[in-house]
A protein has these predicted regions:
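C-terminal helical/tail subdomains of lipid-metabolizing enzymes
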Residues: 2, 6-16, 37-40, 197, ...
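Non-catalytic, mobile gating and regulatory segments of ester bond hydrolases
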Residues: 8-42, 103, 107
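Surface-exposed acidic, glycine-flexible loop patches that form ligand/cofactor-binding
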Residues: 30-37, 68-73, 142-157, 226-230
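Patatin-like phospholipase
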Residues: 42-46, 51-141, 181-186
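Extended hydrophobic secondary-structure segments that form protein cores and membrane-embedded regions
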Residues: 44-47, 77-83, 157-161, 235-246, ...
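Surface cap/lid and interfacial helix-loop subdomains adjacent to catalytic sites
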Residues: 130-155, 249-279
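Active-site gating loop/helix substructures
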Residues: 151-227, 259
Length: 334
């Protein structure tokens, strides 16, 4: 039964990745080149989406940095992310920033700024509008990335979004044929429906959070690394954002309308697919390591930036290091 499920999954993924081919951009500089191929082992770091729970990955990676004495960028050849994970991937890859600095970026002040709500925001939310405005987080991202393009990234970087007009997933990368500004790509990849407005890119696309089609982009990251490097061996470290084990009352759900499903985290349900994990376990079991765990005392809401919730998210990241630290060092051949 499981073999048939994996075959169906592989068939679905082969059709899904057809839509990830870059579109030619006449404005791309002709001298921009892809990284040189190599037959050596290449390491990929992939981040799930998960809103404020992205802090846990930063805490975990800071522990890895402390253990090795090197910034995270020194250990990986490709960074991949979706939604909040796209922010983490971009932050680490673009300027080879340390995980300690990434953790600082996930501060309460920055979170509250990116999720700032005015009186009118609240009024519009109850009038069927997005919960937050894009303006505050755009200002925050521009402060760090300025107007830079993805192809200026110090390390290969890829983010997943979804093109709502073409109804296709879209991969934005530092090595593709179309150029994207980093702040725009991060905003688009994390424009979660209900929370943020659709993002109109400078190149014309209307994009939303890529997590609506794949909240664990590790399999896409593996495929991209194979195409990009041509390496004999690709190793993927995939970092999640916690697993929601809260029971849903099946009989009660039969009577839920739109508000009932929203109240019971329908978006979270859509983002919990384990397909990528199962496929990678079948394809490259020894070269794939997944960091994740159930959420204990953590609010599953993606925008709960309360002190108590962030404290528990930070604790989850610390527990990941206690549980997976030795495995990660062995995996990275440190």
């Amino acid at each position: 039964m499981k073999t048939n499920q994996l075959k169906l999954g592989l068939n679905f993924f082969s059709r899904f990745t057809r839509y990830l081919k870059p579109v030619t951009n006449p404005f791309r500089p002709p001298d921009n080149k892809k990284p040189v191929s190599s037959s050596s082992t290449k390491f990929v770091l992939s981040f799930d989406g998960g809103g404020v729970r992205g802090l846990a990955a930063a805490v975990f990676l800071k522990a890895l940095e402390k253990e090795t004495g090197f910034p995270i960028s020194k250990h990986f050849d490709l960074f991949m992310g979706v939604s909040a994970g796209g922010l983490s991937a971009s932050y680490l890859a673009f300027n080879q920033t340390s995980a300690e600095e990434l953790e600082a970026f996930w501060s309460v002040d920055n979170l509250n700024l990116s999720m700032k709500r005015t009186f009118w925001d609240k009024a519009l939310y109850f009038n069927n509008k997005p919960k937050y405005s894009n303006a505050p987080r755009e200002a925050l991202l521009k402060k760090h990335f300025s107007e830079s393009f993805m192809d200026e990234s110090a390390k290969p970087l890829a983010l997943l979004a979804y093109d709502i007009e073409r109804r296709t997933p879209l991969l934005m990368s530092s090595y593709g044929e179309r150029r994207y500004r980093v702040f725009e790509a991060v905003m688009a990849s994390s424009a979660a429906p209900l929370f943020y407005p659709t993002v109109k890119m400078e190149s014309g696309e209307w994009l939303i959070d890529g997590g609506v089609v794949d909240n664990n982009p590790s399999l896409i990251a593996y495929v991209e690394a194979k195409k990009l490097f041509g390496a004999d061996r690709i190793k993927v470290l995939s970092i999640g954002s916690g697993v929601n084990k809260k029971r849903i009352d099946g009989s009660a759900s039969a009577d839920w309308g739109p508000m009932g499903w929203l109240k019971n985290d329908v978006l979270g349900l859509l983002l919990e697919s384990q397909m990528d994990h199962e496929l990678l376990m079948a394809l490259i079991r020894e070269d794939y390591l997944r960091i994740n765990s159930p959420m204990h005392s953590i609010n599953a809401d993606m925008d709960d930036s309360s002190d108590s919730n962030l404290k528990m998210i930070r604790y989850m990241g610390e527990m990941w290091w206690s549980q997976f630290g030795d495995d990660v060092k062995k995996f990275l051949e440190i």
